[in-house]
């Protein structure tokens, strides 16, 4: 290669470089800069999305823990309410049993009094009849009452000694 050829090649190369620099370099550089900005924006968006996802996951985990605590609280409250209801039912049943016992005892006492009064009247009638037959006369009310009271007292003493 001669000096003229080398010089021609060098000048052609420089002219071509200037033409490429003026025509193609700016669009290629702009395209590369735009691509770099897009990649940087995508990376920033991906990082933001990852942080948002982490924050959302943490929030969901916290809500899950709160809901579990609420569920435990609800279960414990239900147990307490159930125990209170059970105790209330037991107390009501015990009160009813106590009332029934008192009523039964009252009924027993009344029946005993009625039986004693009936027996007293029967004994009085029987005593009066026997006394009339033995004595042969009618007793007045005071005599009759005295005989009946005496008989009942002896009857009570006899029953009490057994």
From Swiss-Prot:
It is found in: Cell membrane. The keyword Cell membrane applies. Its main location: membrane. One of its GO terms (cellular component) is proton-transporting ATP synthase complex. Gene3D superfamilies: 6.10.250.1580. It is a single-pass membrane protein. CDD domains: ATP-synt_Fo_b (cd06503). The chain crosses the membrane at residues 6-25. F-type ATPases have 2 components, F(1) - the catalytic core - and F(0) - the membrane proton channel. F(1) has five subunits: alpha(3), beta(3), gamma(1), delta(1), epsilon(1). F(0) has three main subunits: a(1), b(2) and c(10-14). The alpha and beta chains form an alternating ring which encloses part of the gamma chain. F(1) is attached to F(0) by a central stalk formed by the gamma and epsilon chains, while a peripheral stalk is formed by the delta and b chains. NCBIfam families: ATP_synt_b (TIGR01144). Belongs to the ATPase B chain family. HAMAP family: ATP_synth_b_bprime. F(1)F(0) ATP synthase produces ATP from ADP in the presence of a proton or sodium gradient. F-type ATPases consist of two structural domains, F(1) containing the extramembraneous catalytic core and F(0) containing the membrane proton channel, linked together by a central stalk and a peripheral stalk. During catalysis, ATP synthesis in the catalytic domain of F(1) is coupled via a rotary mechanism of the central stalk subunits to proton translocation. Component of the F(0) channel, it forms part of the peripheral stalk, linking F(1) to F(0). This is ATP synthase subunit b. The lineage of its organism: Bacteria, Bacillati, Bacillota, Bacilli, Lactobacillales.
């Amino acid at each position: 290669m001669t000096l003229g050829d080398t010089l021609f090649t060098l000048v052609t190369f420089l002219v071509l470089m200037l033409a490429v620099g003026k025509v193609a370099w700016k669009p290629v550089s702009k395209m590369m800069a735009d691509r770099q900005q897009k990649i940087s924006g995508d990376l920033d968006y991906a990082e933001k999305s990852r942080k948002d996802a982490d924050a959302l996951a943490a929030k969901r985990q916290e809500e899950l823990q709160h809901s579990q605590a609420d569920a435990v609280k609800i279960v414990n409250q239900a147990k307490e309410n159930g125990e209170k209801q059970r105790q209330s039912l037991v107390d009501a049943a015990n009160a009813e049993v106590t009332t029934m016992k008192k009523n039964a005892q009252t009924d027993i006492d009344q029946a005993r009094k009625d039986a004693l009064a009936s027996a007293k009247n029967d004994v009085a009638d029987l005593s009066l009849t026997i006394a009339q037959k033995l004595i042969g006369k009618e007793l007045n009310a005071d005599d009759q009452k005295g005989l009946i009271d005496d008989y009942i007292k002896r009857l009570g003493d006899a029953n009490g000694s057994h």
